């Protein structure tokens, strides 16, 4: 069942689990150059260091927040009305778009007039779609190349910096040891960024709006922000920024309802999904997507060929350019921010997959391969690519050029079909850039660790540093049920090498449609991989959160340890399985080692002894050894004593 008959728009409500703030956290907003540039962040409050450890103040930590208004107690959430149109005034003020009299897509008009879908439709949209005025280009890349810094670019610069400078200043002002504390907490290991411009000796001290503009103008970063998705909070995808992650959701022909997919979206962004892809393949795709977009503060991506295939009852050979074009316009006018389009699957590459272990595993890739073979013609996506660009730039939809020939097993990694398609994607990127259309490139797949860097190096070369967006890659094929881990390993590596966004993999990969728990597991695993990549690249400020958590751990501030982690709920749950009492939250040990074998407790004891003796820690250890030596001789120099 793909549309739960119990779902009625009149009864729709937000998932209560998605709206509560995380423990000891609150939503804060940083205002930009104009009052409506209000950039959300999550402020994590910390306890003061106990007197026994120095009695220091620990100011709040600020972290990137993708949850939108859902975790803001002051926001009124009604998913039947959708989110506020945050960017609407910015879009209108540019004066290069117009409101349409109605939907342009034939299919969109048919759905709006179909009484059978009346009870499923999103009821809260009271505006018509927008499109570029004749002769205008409304992409963020076009503005960037004109030297224009948009409000979206300023928003992103503030967001990427995460108030790092303010945090260090608050440390300096925290007490007599403030300067020393700021130096310690701001310390970071040098990274290896493999030539990325934002790292190393020439790195900017902070991300500026001008830096954002320049990266977008060069094509090294994209801002997915359809003019018909004004509810979205601007974000950026590029190798010189924080590594982002995507969460896939969507119904299928056999399971899930509209309500469940909206819940998955709100759950995914709560835990850190930077973008969400709706990969629905069942009925009511149009209605499901509308509900998701209107309630999403993050960019939404789709694979339009999936819906086009539904329109021809699943028969790939009956697809036409006209049906696909209408689908693009339908989705662009709903507000989809980026389209995965498998225009690199060319007729000449299909035979190259014949000797693969797992053939063509991409759904979109297999659809286009079947069409090419059925008609023995070049793909209509490839043939009509410039026309697709014209549609994209009228709504500012970004390309996510699909890897339809990605390897589905490590056996097939880096083969001729995969790399041939990648080279074609580089050629298509140049065509899109000619139209000032934003582009990112999708990548594999299943790749053993020793072949991952080759993928990244070839992509940077052939696609001229357009952002890379990879599914993992999975580094081994032996762990069904654990592919969030097999892929998380590859994701951390390729993120370090330069991938800009990682598409999450859940434990259900290859096995079934993920539920909410699987979504969270995939998100947390990939947030971890992305952060590890930021650390390895030497992203400015990436280590601040690690330093704060390590300090909390050493000072036995258990609540702060939980709250500074990626998943406070799980950390607290694991701790409380063995030490559930409140008193354990201030204990100087955990259940791993107990009170007598805690390495950190022993270190603290050494420091206390040193302070009492008025000597250094090294001298304290030496003095302690001497005391024990005297005790040993006095006891008879016996290693063992009979009881």
UniProtKB/Swiss-Prot annotation:
E.C. number(s) listed in UniProt: 4.1.99.17
Pathway(s) this gene product operates in, as recorded in its UniProt entry: Cofactor biosynthesis; thiamine diphosphate biosynthesis
Cofactor remark: Binds 1 [4Fe-4S] cluster per subunit. The cluster is coordinated with 3 cysteines and an exchangeable S-adenosyl-L-methionine.
GO CC aspect terms: cytosol
GO molecular function, one term: 4 iron, 4 sulfur cluster binding
Sites where the protein binds [4Fe-4S] cluster: 590, 593, 598
NCBIfam families found in the cross-reference section: PRK09284.1, PRK13352.1, thiC
Name of protein: Phosphomethylpyrimidine synthase
Organism per entry: Burkholderia multivorans (strain ATCC 17616 / 249)
Gene label: thiC
């Amino acid at each position: 069942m793909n549309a739960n008959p119990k779902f009625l728009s009149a009864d729709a409500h937000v998932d209560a689990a998605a709206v509560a703030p995380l423990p000891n956290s609150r939503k804060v907003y940083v205002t930009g150059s104009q009052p409506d540039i209000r950039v959300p962040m999550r402020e994590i409050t910390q306890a003061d260091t106990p007197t026994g450890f120095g009695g220091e103040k620990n100011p709040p930590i600020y972290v990137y927040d993708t949850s939108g208004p859902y975790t803001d107690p002051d926001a009124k959430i009604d998913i039947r009305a959708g989110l506020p149109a945050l960017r609407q005034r910015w879009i209108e003020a540019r004066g290069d778009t117009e409101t349409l009299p109605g939907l342009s897509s034939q299919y969109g008009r048919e759905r709006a007039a179909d009484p059978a879908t009346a009870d499923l439709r999103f009821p809260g949209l009271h505006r018509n779609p927008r499109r570029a005025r004749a002769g205008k280009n409304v992409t963020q890349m076009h503005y960037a190349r004109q030297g224009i810094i948009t409000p979206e670019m300023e928003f992103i610069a503030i967001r990427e910096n995460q108030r790092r400078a303010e945090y260090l200043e608050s440390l300096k002002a925290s007490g007599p040891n403030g300067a020393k504390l700021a130096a310690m907490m701001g310390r970071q290991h040098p990274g290896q960024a493999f030539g990325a411009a934002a790292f190393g000796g020439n790195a900017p001290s902070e991300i500026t709006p001008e830096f954002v503009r320049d990266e977008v103008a060069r094509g090294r970063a994209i801002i997915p922000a359809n003019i018909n998705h004004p509810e979205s909070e601007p974000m950026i995808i590029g190798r010189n920024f924080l590594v982002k992650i995507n969460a896939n959701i969507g119904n299928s022909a056999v399971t899930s309802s509209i309500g469940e997919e909206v819940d998955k979206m709100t759950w995914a962004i709560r835990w850190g999904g930077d973008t969400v892809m709706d990969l629905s393949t069942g009925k009511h795709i149009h209605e499901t997507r509308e509900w998701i977009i209107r309630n999403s503060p993050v960019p939404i991506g789709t694979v339009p060929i999936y819906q086009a295939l539904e329109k021809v009852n699943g028969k790939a050979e009956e697809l036409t350019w006209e049906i696909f074009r209408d689908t693009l316009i339908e989705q662009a006018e709903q507000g989809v921010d980026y389209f995965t389009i498998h225009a690199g699957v060319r007729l000449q590459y299909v035979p190259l997959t014949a000797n693969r272990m797992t053939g063509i595993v991409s759904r979109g890739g297999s659809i286009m391969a079947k069409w090419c073979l059925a008609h023995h013609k070049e793909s209509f996506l490839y043939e009509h690519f410039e026309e697709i660009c014209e549609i994209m730039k009228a709504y500012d939809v970004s390309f996510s050029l699909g890897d339809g020939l990605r390897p589905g097993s490590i056996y097939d990694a880096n083969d001729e079909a995969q790399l041939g398609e990648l080279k074609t994607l580089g050629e298509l990127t140049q065509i899109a850039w000619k139209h000032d259309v934003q582009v990112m490139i999708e990548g594999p797949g299943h790749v053993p660790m020793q072949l991952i860097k080759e993928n990244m190096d070839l992509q940077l070369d052939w696609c001229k540093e357009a952002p890379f967006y990879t599914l993992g890659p999975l580094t081994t094929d032996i762990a069904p049920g654990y592919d969030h881990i097999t892929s998380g390993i590859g994701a951390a590596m390729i993120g370090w090498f330069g991938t800009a966004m990682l598409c999450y993999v859940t434990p259900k990969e290859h096995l079934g449609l993920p539920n909410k728990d699987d979504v969270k597991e995939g998100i947390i695993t990939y947030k971890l991989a992305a952060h590890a990549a930021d650390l390895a690249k030497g992203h400015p400020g990436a280590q601040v959160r690690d330093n704060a958590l390590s300090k909390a751990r050493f000072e036995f501030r258990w609540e702060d340890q939980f709250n500074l982690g990626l998943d406070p709920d799980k950390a607290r749950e694991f701790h409380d399985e063995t030490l559930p009492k409140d008193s354990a939250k201030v204990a100087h040990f955990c259940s791993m080692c107990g009170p007598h074998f805690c390495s950190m407790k022993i270190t603290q004891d050494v420091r206390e002894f040193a302070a009492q003796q008025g000597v250094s820690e090294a001298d304290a250890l030496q003095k302690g050894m001497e005391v024990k030596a005297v005790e040993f001789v006095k006891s008879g120099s016996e290693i063992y004593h009979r009881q």
